[in-house]
Amino acid sequence: MNKNNLIGNYTIALFNNAMVDNIQDKVFEEITSINSIITDNVDIREFLFSPIVNKNDKIKAINSLAKNTKINTIVYNFLLLLIKNFRMTILSDIISVFNKLLCESKNIKIVQVISANKLKPKEQEWIKSHIEKELNQKTEILFDIDSNIIGGIVIKYDSMLQDYSIKGSLDKITKVLKKVNINT
């Protein structure tokens, strides 16, 4: 089974379990929090991701983590399932897909906005309001930074790409100039 199918299957199972009790938001919040603890702590991450560490020791670690964070039974059982099946390494990917499912269930479109520098909160709000107005839909904006675009922004959602960057403009100009045949 390829990795994307595997991630999709685990995510759908988790999402459906959360839907039964109508706690999708809570499950997302808890599993994201647990993932942050794991990714922020190198020792925990290496311990849980290591194929050498005994499965029972990993389960004890999850039990301890669950006790300290008071996580929901669904999240707890899901983490145990990942441990038992040696799948903890795909937790971040599962969370990403879970977020997409959560947004789809609320009719919220996920939009990625790439800028050359970190945008100020007012700029982020302005961009969000204009995108929501253009799409006539609520959005969740993921702001990323890529200094290669030089300036401006690039907006991505679904299969759409709107390039308002300086690099994009320069690339278009370069493409046009290459097409122009200059004979002297």
Swiss-Prot record:
GO cellular component: plasma membrane; proton-transporting ATP synthase complex
Keywords: ATP synthesis, Cell inner membrane, Cell membrane, CF(1), Hydrogen ion transport, Ion transport, Membrane, Transport
GO molecular function, one term: proton-transporting ATP synthase activity, rotational mechanism
Pfam families in the cross-refs: OSCP (PF00213)
Source organism, top-level taxon: Bacteria
Bilayer topology: Peripheral membrane protein
Protein's cellular compartments: Cell inner membrane
InterPro entries the record matches: ATP_synth_OSCP/delta_N_sf, ATPase_OSCP/dsu
Role played: F(1)F(0) ATP synthase produces ATP from ADP in the presence of a proton or sodium gradient. F-type ATPases consist of two structural domains, F(1) containing the extramembraneous catalytic core and F(0) containing the membrane proton channel, linked together by a central stalk and a peripheral stalk. During catalysis, ATP synthesis in the catalytic domain of F(1) is coupled via a rotary mechanism of the central stalk subunits to proton translocation.
Subunit composition and interactions: F-type ATPases have 2 components, F(1) - the catalytic core - and F(0) - the membrane proton channel. F(1) has five subunits: alpha(3), beta(3), gamma(1), delta(1), epsilon(1). F(0) has three main subunits: a(1), b(2) and c(10-14). The alpha and beta chains form an alternating ring which encloses part of the gamma chain. F(1) is attached to F(0) by a central stalk formed by the gamma and epsilon chains, while a peripheral stalk is formed by the delta and b chains.
Entries under HAMAP family matching the protein: ATP_synth_delta_bact (MF_01416)
Family affiliation: Belongs to the ATPase delta chain family.
Name by which UniProt lists this protein: ATP synthase subunit delta
